[in-house]
């Protein structure tokens, strides 16, 4: 967050993450959020343990609030980042992991206008997002 960066400065490269307070989703992240804790492991040699965290939460909104409050550094999906939030991307040259998204509905509704319009809207929005 901007609060964190004003207080501690931004990491310049992945090695700087070794000295940053990291916030993680926790050990039981759902499969849809696989690799959400990638700041703990990026750049870490395979024989080393993941970076330590100062806080683990069990939902993505809690992760957002902790990062936003300047508690530490963590990973959020793009769709949670809005211009009105005091967040700042760090290490922009590094792409985080991506996540698959599924739109599930009853087969008998496949050809309805309502489902088609909503599907088109979701596809348009999802193309803008990354995790």
Regions of interest found by a model, annotated:
Residues 1-101, 127-131:
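C-terminal regulatory
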Residues 64, 105, 119:
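A cross-family signal for key residues in well-ordered alpha-helices
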